[in-house]
Amino acid sequence: MYLSDGKKETQYIVKDIGLPTGIEKRLEALGMTRGTSVTVLNSKSKGILIVKVRGTRFALGRNITEHISVAT
């Protein structure tokens, strides 16, 4: 399952991040690494996903979240 398929108010564990190195490093700097808990707070209509990682909230586009593999 990918994070882009996540449901609101649900917590997931990041299994893999299949993005270019630069974007993956940026997500790591924000605290999103393999094994990290991620909560989907909201899913906006234009493809934006609001997530909470290690106490920090931020928005990610579908073009990024569809490459982040997660498990419940």
Predicted regions and their residues:
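Compact, glycine-rich, soluble single-domain proteins
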Residues: M1-T72
